[in-house]
């Protein structure tokens, strides 16, 4: 069968309707859950890099030194200093801090040997910087996206990478993708966020288009696709026309009573909700393409996320994360003003909703418990 793995970025399980989300609507992901299996206890890592390495290599992130974690920002520097592709390739390869042993096995490599054509679209590999030679060594026939995960936190890069070449994104002028600070607040940060100069082509749209094209081109071959989108990783950034939750009454009401500068954060929360909804629409586009190509009965679709929930819609992400001397809950959801309760999870025989302790960057439930849905109509029971 074809295998399509949709891998969200920083998406807490509580942000999806099928896992109990009440404000943000995710009908396409909910449909996947309804027609397949929805896991309530799937565990990943506390942040992106080790989670993605485990996914692609099958190694436990704490027990193996065989994967290479590099520093981020190299592609940003390359653009600012005018490096050629060849210069960047050499510098990226030299930047590897943990040298691979040479005996590793990679998921796309195995599937390629089994006759699959392999494609990765989005936030490439595990980061924080990868390069063409590494991607080919791992078994990817086609790739389009960000080689630099630091740059992937900006949604309007001037180019993406496509099979070793730069794929220009029209109208974009920012070497760092137009990234703004990850915490939200009034003043200079908000002014910069509101400046749309050099922000024309939304990178997730370009990566989705390349994914759908790859599916069309390989409809008669077994495909493995890793759609590793950077949605909804912060800082919040969505095309204004797609800010579907602007002025949402439940969000506005929650923030009206917030303390201090957090009263100014309702707009960020609305944009974050719109980013999750955008992710859901992209899942819907992939499902529609599967249907259009007549591939439903021979396509396994897996949906998951790299780690637990993160707060990108308040003025201070860190307050409340520490474990108190009495062993109290880490994230203090009420204090942190998470109107979405993105760290919620299903628990118990009746799947009651609870607030999970911890967020991204912690090894507590809210940081490492992630959504997992598997759908294969006619084969996987629902």
Per-segment meaning from a language model:
Residues 13-116, 130, 152, 166, ...:
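Active-site segment of extracytoplasmic enzymes that catalyze sulfate/phosphate-ester chemistry
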Residues 56-61, 136-139, 319-320:
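Short, hinge-like loop/turn segments at secondary-structure boundaries
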Residues 8-24, 31, 40, 44-47, ...:
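Active-site-proximal cap/lid insertion segments
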Residues 2-8:
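Short beta-strand segments enriched in small/hydrophobic residues
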């Amino acid at each position: 069968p074809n295998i399509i793995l949709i891998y969200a970025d920083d998406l807490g399980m509580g942000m999806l309707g099928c896992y109990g989300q009440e404000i943000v609507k995710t009908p396409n992901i909910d449909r996947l859950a309804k027609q397949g299996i929805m896991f309530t206890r799937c565990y990943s890592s506390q942040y992106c890099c080790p989670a993605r390495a485990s996914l692609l290599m099958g190694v436990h992130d704490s027990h193996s030194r065989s994967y290479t974690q590099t520093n981020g920002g190299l592609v940003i520097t390359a653009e600012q200093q005018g490096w050629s592709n060849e210069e960047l390739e050499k510098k990226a390869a030299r930047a590897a801090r943990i040298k691979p042993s040479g005996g590793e096995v990679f998921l796309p490599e195995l599937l390629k040997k089994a006759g699959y054509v392999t494609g990765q679209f989005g936030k490439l590999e595990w980061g924080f910087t990868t390069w063409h030679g590494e991607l080919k060594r791992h078994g990817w026939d086609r790739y389009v996206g960000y080689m630099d995960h630091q740059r992937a936190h900006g949604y309007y890069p001037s180019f993406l990478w496509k099979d070793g070449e730069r794929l220009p994104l029209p109208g974009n002028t920012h070497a760092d993708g137009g990234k703004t600070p990850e915490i939200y607040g009034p003043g200079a940060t908000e002014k910069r966020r509101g400046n749309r100069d050099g922000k024309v082509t939304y990178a997730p749209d370009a990566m989705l288009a390349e994914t759908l094209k790859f599916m069309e081109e390989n409809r008669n071959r077994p495909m493995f696709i890793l759609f590793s989108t950077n949605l909804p990783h912060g800082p919040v950034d969505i095309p204004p026309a797609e800010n579907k939750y602007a002025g949402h009454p439940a969000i506005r009401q929650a923030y009206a009573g917030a303390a201090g500068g957090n009263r100014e954060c309702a707009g960020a929360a609305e944009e974050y909700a719109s980013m999750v909804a955008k992710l859901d629409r992209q899942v819907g586009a992939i499902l529609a393409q599967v249907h259009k190509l007549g591939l439903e009965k021979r396509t396994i679709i897996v949906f998951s996320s790299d780690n637990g929930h993160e707060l990108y819609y308040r003025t201070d992400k860190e307050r409340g994360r520490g474990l108190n001397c009495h062993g109290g809950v880490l994230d203090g959801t009420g204090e942190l003003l998470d109107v979405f309760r993105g760290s919620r999870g299903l628990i118990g025989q009746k799947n009651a909703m609870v607030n999970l302790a911890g967020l991204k960057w912690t090894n507590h439930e809210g940081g490492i418990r992630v959504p997992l849905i598997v759908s294969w109509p006619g084969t996987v029971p629902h």
